[in-house]
Amino acid sequence: MNPSPLLHLIDSPQDLRRLDKKQLPRLAGELRAFLLESVGQTGGHFASNLGAVELTIALHYVYDTPEDKLVWDVGHQSYPHKILTGRKNQMHTMRQYGGLAGFPKRCESEYDAFGVGHSSTSIGAALGMAAADKLLGGDRRSVAIIGDGAMTAGQAFEALNCAGDMDVDLLVVLNDNEMSISPNVGALPKYLASNVVRDMHGLLSTVKAQTGKVLDKIPGAMEFAQKVEHKIKTLAEEAEHAKQSLSLFENFGFRYTGPVDGHNVENLVDVLKDLRSRKGPQLLHVITKKGNGYKLAENDPVKYHAVANLPKEGGAQMPSEKEPKPAAKPTYTQVFGKWLCDRAAADSRLVAITPAMREGSGLVEFEQRFPDRYFDVGIAEQHAVTFAGGLACEGMKPVVAIYSTFLQRAYDQLVHDIALQNLPVLFAVDRAGIVGADGPTHAGLYDLSFLRCVPNMIVAAPSDENECRLLLSTCYQADAPAAVRYPRGTGTGAPVSDGMETVEIGKGIIRREGEKTAFIAFGSMVATALAVAEKLNATVADMRFVKPIDEELIVRLARSHDRIVTLEENAEQGGAGGAVLEVLAKHGICKPVLLLGVADTVTEHGDPKKLLDDLGLSAEAVERRVREWLPDRDAAN
């Protein structure tokens, strides 16, 4: 017997719209069960998708997609959308090489109106679509679906401010679950969640005082009165909640509706039908529960935000509560987290800043041990960097823990607010290089290129876990802005010191002596260079720093070898290999140079090893490319 008879009938939103509205709650249950099964086996974003099931069904039921445009913010919650838009039978390939992307992707489906991965872009994109439709004389509807966490970012407010002053038909759906990845921070979430109802509570207190003695004498009356009191409180709080939210968004020029139960799919359909007929900017405030329908995720939405897989228990189609086995080798994130706590214990000036990535950036222990020196500024990368600059001006030692892909969002602040003033801010740049399943929106392939051209910046790339700690300590003590970039996942297994040793800034080291060919390698590619060099009897230099780069070492290697190969897990254009070429040109050295990095292409999602091989950066691919490049007599050696 088919466990999902309704879902089985749906291959497109057109099929969905043939259902009776009363069938939608049952469909929601089937879709949620399908999510538990599919994500449980393939992994992926979990809790946010469970919370968006009814909302997704209602949106596709009411709006004429793909003619009407649904723009999902970030895209963590887009799995139900993919299931309902013809990709149900491909869900087993989610985030795998050659399979479905973990986020909406325009080239994947006509229903994916806008490619996403970063937060707070949906309102601006949907507004642009609405403006284009008006200019072209169309009658389409544009809908932005954004979470309350993403709404804290400045870009979302910039778009709200612009939309409120434009005569376009735009609906913003605020999916309010009080979470982004971590619990939300800042004034806006408190504003949205405020339940201050002083007058009603005062009235209730008076009534209780006046009637309590009488009610005590009537059997069952007190219990009934308590239920009535609870209901009145709830209604009053909802009314106050709506009043406050209405005031905020209507001041932006939006007509506010809500808050609405985001898990009552039939009511959502009625509300959305009404909103679709309205003109001008509209905002629908929907209350949902992250992880809805799976208790473990409801109780710990941070832990279940994304999962590697959820094994079955006893054959049941339910996630397992078993924790994954800890890695034998520490991750670079763990190395950073331990270094940060050790350094903070020795230096009371150290403060840590994160743009809503406490868990991912390894700051959980730091927050617990040093809460007064921990700052989660929300999804606000630009503010995080400028805030760090202000702290540095007053003698503090800020460490900004940020993913490479998110540092892109704060580039002006890095240049204007930090580097031009030569402020000693340390950027711990996580997820540098290929990241795997999250794909191109999260790949850290551009930081070496955009950092090394910034004045006063020190840019370091460790080759293993111990070197990561060494370079963090070194850059922390530098009286200048600095960035240490390190990859996702585990390193080489190198023993990690507990000390605070430092190295000389701008100096690399020779890892292997060889002949004729010199590998000048950066960061994670040092291990690859060593593996290939064993087969080619080549020299390997671990440069450690991209800026300042070790000119003396480069010149010495160029003059003592026949050729040079540069290796980096970064874009070739403007990257570390380019820095090597600049040194050679400066010193008038003309030698054959092979630059190996990420070519001018958009990387895909999938297993990192497979992606590196496709990009020509695995050890096997590097050996093949170098042998093809070598003169025939050397390639045979």
From Swiss-Prot:
One Gene Ontology MF term: 1-deoxy-D-xylulose-5-phosphate synthase activity
Q: Which cofactor does it need?
A: Mg(2+); thiamine diphosphate
Cofactor binding summary note = Binds 1 Mg(2+) ion per subunit.
Q: What keywords were assigned to this record?
A: Isoprene biosynthesis, Magnesium, Metal-binding, Thiamine biosynthesis, Thiamine pyrophosphate, Transferase
Under the heading InterPro entries, the entry gives:
Dxylulose-5-P_synthase, THDP-binding, Transketo_C/PFOR_II, Transketolase-like_Pyr-bd, Transketolase_BS, Transketolase_C, Transketolase_CS
Catalytic reaction(s) noted: D-glyceraldehyde 3-phosphate + pyruvate + H(+) = 1-deoxy-D-xylulose 5-phosphate + CO2
Provide the residue positions that the database annotates as binding Mg(2+): 148, 177
Which pathway?
Metabolic intermediate biosynthesis; 1-deoxy-D-xylulose 5-phosphate biosynthesis; 1-deoxy-D-xylulose 5-phosphate from D-glyceraldehyde 3-phosphate and pyruvate: step 1/1
Give binding positions for thiamine diphosphate.
76, 117-119, 149-150, 177, 294, 381
This enzyme's EC code(s):
2.2.1.7
Top-level lineage group: Bacteria
The GO biological-process annotations, alphabetized, read as: 1-deoxy-D-xylulose 5-phosphate biosynthetic process; isopentenyl diphosphate biosynthetic process, methylerythritol 4-phosphate pathway; terpenoid biosynthetic process; thiamine biosynthetic process
State a GO cellular component annotated for this protein.
cytosol
Q: Name one Pfam family in it.
A: Transket_pyr
General function of this protein = Catalyzes the acyloin condensation reaction between C atoms 2 and 3 of pyruvate and glyceraldehyde 3-phosphate to yield 1-deoxy-D-xylulose-5-phosphate (DXP).
**How does this chain assemble?**
Homodimer.
Q: Which PANTHER family does the annotation name?
A: 1-D-DEOXYXYLULOSE 5-PHOSPHATE SYNTHASE-RELATED, 1-DEOXY-D-XYLULOSE-5-PHOSPHATE SYNTHASE, CHLOROPLASTIC
Family of the protein in this entry? Belongs to the transketolase family. DXPS subfamily.
What's this protein's name?
1-deoxy-D-xylulose-5-phosphate synthase
